């Protein structure tokens, strides 16, 4: 058999080299095929309709919902603060026969009220109702300056019955000397007991005044404690379904941390023209020497800027 020189059997070394080359070729081919498969699967994973991207959608939706809820909460708080931060144009105040009114577009929008206690003695409420009085704030009780006992105002029931019979809407106020939240809640419970069964048509007010002449038990409380007491009182009253107010003059109210006390303010200042405070207020007690038919003594007069706080009987 004739063998061509070029077709001679390969040597052992040539066989080993060819085997190694074939092995490398096999690995290259395998890598190419595996790479193509990987590329195909990789492209599939990055497709817009990929399963793992679909799983991210609920997370993104949840984040959007949380952002929307946070925005709603912030807007609600802002609106609440705006409702308390009332602004008035004092040029709209009108003065007539010792009384002050507030008008908008030529129409009187305010209400005129009195606040009374045992200091006014016996009151002819029918005569009061005929003298342009729209509502009354009646003192229902007090806490003692020193020992801290609770007392009902001795004319409270008579005044409440008289106002109700005469058709005058009324609220009540309590003179507080609470030194902690527990006592403030006790005062609120006492008020609720006193007004049980009555038609309370106006807010219930928390009245804490500085009494330096009497060395009163609540004189030296911190702003933090006074604010906590007021909130405890107001929260209990609101739980019972009533609206609330905080009463005081500039000095009294400066004792509170008003940034953390989001209640309506009943402000006292007797300058006879307009309030000079920057404190947001809804009612202004503008004199302690008012004259009203049916009351033999001087009486406090008030202008209520938000008539919605008085509910007809």
Task: Go through the PLM ranges and name each one.
Residues 48-64:
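Short, low-complexity patches enriched in S/T/P/G
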Residues 75-94:
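Sec-dependent signal peptide cleavage junction
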Residues 4, 90-122, 126, 260-313:
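Functionally critical loop-and-helix segments that line ligand-binding/catalytic clefts
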Residues 192-212, 257-280:
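Structural recognition of alpha->loop->beta junctions
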Residues 237-254:
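Aromatic-lined carbohydrate-recognition surfaces of secreted/lumenal glycan-active proteins
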Residues 60-81:
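Hydrophobic membrane-insertion alpha-helices, especially the h-region
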């Amino acid at each position: 058999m004739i063998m061509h020189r070029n077709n001679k059997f390969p040597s052992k070394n040539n066989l080993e080299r060819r085997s190694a080359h074939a092995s490398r070729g096999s690995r290259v081919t395998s890598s190419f095929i595996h790479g193509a498969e990987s590329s195909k699967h990789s492209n599939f994973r990055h497709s817009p309709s990929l399963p793992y991207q679909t799983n991210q959608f609920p997370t993104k939706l949840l984040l959007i919902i949380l952002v929307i809820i946070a925005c709603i909460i912030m807007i609600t708080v802002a609106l609440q603060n705006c409702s308390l931060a009332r602004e008035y144009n004092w040029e709209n105040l009108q003065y007539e026969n010792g009384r002050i009114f507030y008008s908008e577009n030529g129409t009187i929008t305010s209400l005129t009220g009195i606040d009374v206690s045992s200091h006014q003695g016996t009151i002819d409420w029918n005569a009061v109702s005929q003298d342009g009085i729209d509502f009354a704030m009646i003192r229902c009780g007090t806490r003692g300056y020193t020992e801290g006992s609770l007392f009902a105002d001795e004319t409270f029931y008579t005044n409440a019955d008289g106002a109700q019979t005469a058709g005058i809407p009324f609220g009540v106020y309590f003179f507080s000397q609470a030194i902690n939240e527990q006592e403030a809640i006790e005062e609120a419970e006492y008020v609720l007991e006193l007004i049980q069964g009555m038609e309370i048509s106006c807010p219930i007010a928390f009245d804490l005044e500085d009494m330096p002449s009497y060395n009163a038990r609540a004189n030296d409380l911190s702003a933090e404690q006074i604010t906590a007491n007021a909130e405890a009182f107001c929260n209990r009253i609101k739980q019972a379904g009533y609206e609330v107010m905080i009463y005081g003059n500039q000095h009294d109210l400066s004792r509170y941390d008003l940034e953390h006390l989001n209640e309506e303010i009943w402000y006292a200042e007797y300058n006879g023209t307009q309030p000079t405070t920057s404190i947001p207020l809804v009612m202004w007690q503008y004199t302690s020497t008012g004259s009203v038919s049916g009351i033999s003594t001087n009486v406090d007069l008030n202008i209520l800027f938000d008539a919605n706080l008085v509910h007809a009987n």
